[in-house]
Every structure is written in C-alpha cells, then in structure tokens.
C-alpha cells in the first residue's frame, strides 16, 4: 500500500522524520489485512482552522477534531485510491501532552486510526470498537510504538 503525505502546517513539524514509521504501519496493515500493494491513500497534516472547516462542511460537526477520514470505496466499486485522511497537527501535540505519551505515539496512533477508517473499520458499535481498537493496539505494539512517554517499551 502506498501513500502521499502533504504537510500544510506552518510549524517546526517535519513529517519526513516520521515517514519511516508511517511506511511501517502501512506495510504491516497491508500484510495483516491482505491489502493490494497498488492501493494508495493521501494523508494531509493540517491546522486547527482547516480541520474544523472540513469537519463542519463535510460532517456537519463544527469543532476541531484530531483525524478525519474519507473512504472512497463504496463497498461495490473498488478504486486504487482508498481515500484521504486529515490529521490536525495541534491536536497531536495537545493530546500527546494530555495522555502523557510521546508526540510520535500520538501521531502514529492517529495515522493508524485514520487508515483503518479508510479500510472500512469503525467504532460506532461496541463490537466494531473492540475490533478496530484491538487492531490499532496490535499494530502499534508490534512496531513498539507504546504509550510510554518516550514512545517505546524500554524507556
């Protein structure tokens, strides 16, 4: 599975540092879920204003959120493009502090969460949530991306 990253945030954030982690996550999900390697998606890092506008305009929810995914598959027609996800940089920073773990862990969590939404996973129902969150934890733990403040199990 391939992806395109765009960084629309004017900050010191450099997504290139995390590109290797994103590749590891996408590859592991591809293997676990048997996703064709020709499928691809876009991930956009945006500011609070942009994500609130997207949330308001496309979801009728007028607030800042952390990640929004738009899956392009409708269940009948499968296209090479899985969809697009938008991650709010400032929410990554704030939530990492709030939850007491690293920026890397929060960023990778939201990337994984958004990608699973693109692949049809959801967490509206309790059973769906167990499956999706279980898979998220499995992926992140397998890659040693944990809730530890240093972002790994050993320190």
UniProtKB/Swiss-Prot annotation:
<keyword id="KW-0540">Nuclease</keyword>
<comment type="function">
    <text>Single strand-specific metallo-endoribonuclease involved in late-stage 70S ribosome quality control and in maturation of the 3' terminus of the 16S rRNA.</text>
</comment>
<dbReference type="InterPro" id="IPR020549">
    <property type="entry name" value="YbeY_CS"/>
</dbReference>
<dbReference type="GO" id="GO:0008270">
    <property type="term" value="F:zinc ion binding"/>
</dbReference>
<dbReference type="GO" id="GO:0006364">
    <property type="term" value="P:rRNA processing"/>
</dbReference>
<feature type="binding site">
    <location>
        <position position="113"/>
    </location>
    <ligand>
        <name>Zn(2+)</name>
    </ligand>
</feature>
<dbReference type="GO" id="GO:0004521">
    <property type="term" value="F:RNA endonuclease activity"/>
</dbReference>
<dbReference type="GO" id="GO:0005737">
    <property type="term" value="C:cytoplasm"/>
</dbReference>
<keyword id="KW-0963">Cytoplasm</keyword>
<dbReference type="InterPro" id="IPR002036">
    <property type="entry name" value="YbeY"/>
</dbReference>
<feature type="binding site">
    <location>
        <position position="123"/>
    </location>
    <ligand>
        <name>Zn(2+)</name>
    </ligand>
</feature>
<keyword id="KW-0698">rRNA processing</keyword>
<keyword id="KW-0479">Metal-binding</keyword>
<dbReference type="InterPro" id="IPR023091">
    <property type="entry name" value="MetalPrtase_cat_dom_sf_prd"/>
</dbReference>
<dbReference type="Pfam" id="PF02130">
    <property type="entry name" value="YbeY"/>
</dbReference>
<feature type="binding site">
    <location>
        <position position="117"/>
    </location>
    <ligand>
        <name>Zn(2+)</name>
    </ligand>
</feature>
<protein>
    <recommendedName>
        <fullName>Endoribonuclease YbeY</fullName>
        <ecNumber>3.1.-.-</ecNumber>
    </recommendedName>
</protein>
<dbReference type="GO" id="GO:0004222">
    <property type="term" value="F:metalloendopeptidase activity"/>
</dbReference>
<keyword id="KW-0862">Zinc</keyword>
<keyword id="KW-0255">Endonuclease</keyword>
<comment type="similarity">
    <text>Belongs to the endoribonuclease YbeY family.</text>
</comment>
<keyword id="KW-0378">Hydrolase</keyword>
<keyword id="KW-0690">Ribosome biogenesis</keyword>
